[in-house]
Amino acid sequence: MDFHRLLQHKQQRWQRSSYLLIGLFLSVCVLYLLVGELWLSPFSAWSSLEQQLVWELRLPRLLAAAVIGASLAVAGATLQVLLGNVLAEPGVVGVSGGASVAMVILLLFFPSLNSPVAFMAAAVLGALLFTLLLVVMARKLRLTTARLLLVGVALGILSGAVVTWAFYFSDDLGLRQLMYWLMGSVAGVSWYQHLLSLVAVPVVIWLVLQGGVLDKLMLGEGHAKQLGIDIHRVRWRLILAIALLVGASVALGGVIGFVGLVVPHLLRLTLGSENRLLLPLSALCGALLLVSADLIARLALGSGELPLGVVTTTLGAPIFIWMLVRNHDSC
C-alpha cells in the first residue's frame, strides 16, 4: 500500500509539473507575440501592419525557437542515455559543431544550394558523423566521463578552427552568414524555412514515445536484450534521430548550446530519471527555455538584440560548471 501511494504521489507530481510548464509556456508565447520594439495590446484591434508584424515576423520566430528548444532538449536527454553520461549534450560533445562545419562547407563551396533542404542535409550529415564518432569511441575505448568530455571539447575546438579558417576565405555576405550560424539566432526565420520543422517535429514525437525503450537501455545491454530490445537496431535509430534533430536545429537557428544539457539534468534532479515521463517534459521545458531566452535576446538591448546562443550560453555555462564539480568523483 505504501508503495502504491508513493507511485501515485510521483505520478501526481509529474502531472502537476506538466500543467505548470504548459501554463508557463502558453503565457510566455502570448507575451512573446505582444512585446518588442512595437508593443501590441491584446485588448484592441490590430492594424494591418500589426497583423503582418505578428504573422510574418514574430510567430515564425516563436515557432522556430520552440521547435529548436524541444529538439535540442530531447536530443540531449537521448544522447545522455546513449552515451551513459549525464554531461553529454550536442553542443558540449561537438555534435552541433559537426553540423556547423558541414553547413560552412556548403556555404563556401556550394553557395548556389542556398535552401532549407540543402542546409538540413548538410547539417544532418555533419551531426551524424560526429555522433557516430562519439558513440564508437565511447564504446570501443571505454571512455570515462572526463575523457569523453575532453574528446567532445576537442571536436568542438576542431570545428571552431574550421569555421575560423572559413572566415578568411569568404566574402562579406558569406562572412555574415557564417557569423549568423556560429552565434545562433532565429531572427529573420520565415515560414518557408519551417520546412525544417516538418522534419524535426515528427522526430521529437517519435523520440518522446521511445521513453520506455530508453528506460530499458539504462538497465544495461544484458537486461535490455532479455526484455526483448534489439540493441543494435535501437542504437542506430537513436543516432539517426539525434542527428536529424541537431541538424534541423542548426539549419534553422545556428549553434545554440547547453539547452540539451540543462533541461534534462534539472528535470532529473527535481522529478526523477524515468525517461517515459522525462522526455515529454524535456521537450516542453526546452521549448519554454528557448522561447524565454529569445525574448530576453530581443528585449535586452534597446537598439538591437543579442544572439540567442549568447543568452543560452550565459544561462547554461554556470550550470555546466556546477554539474562538473558535482560529478567530479565519477570523473
UniProtKB/Swiss-Prot annotation:
It is found in: Cell inner membrane. GO terms for cellular component: plasma membrane. The chain crosses the membrane at residues 20-42, 62-84, 91-113, 117-136, 148-170, 190-209, 240-262, 277-299, 306-325. Keywords: Cell inner membrane, Cell membrane, Membrane, Transmembrane, Transmembrane helix, Transport. One of its GO terms (molecular function) is transmembrane transporter activity. Its main location: membrane. Signal peptide: none annotated. GO terms for biological process: cobalamin transport. It is a multi-pass membrane protein. Belongs to the binding-protein-dependent transport system permease family. FecCD subfamily. Part of the ABC transporter complex BtuCDF involved in vitamin B12 import. Involved in the translocation of the substrate across the membrane. The complex is composed of two ATP-binding proteins (BtuD), two transmembrane proteins (BtuC) and a solute-binding protein (BtuF). This is Vitamin B12 import system permease protein BtuC. The gene is btuC.
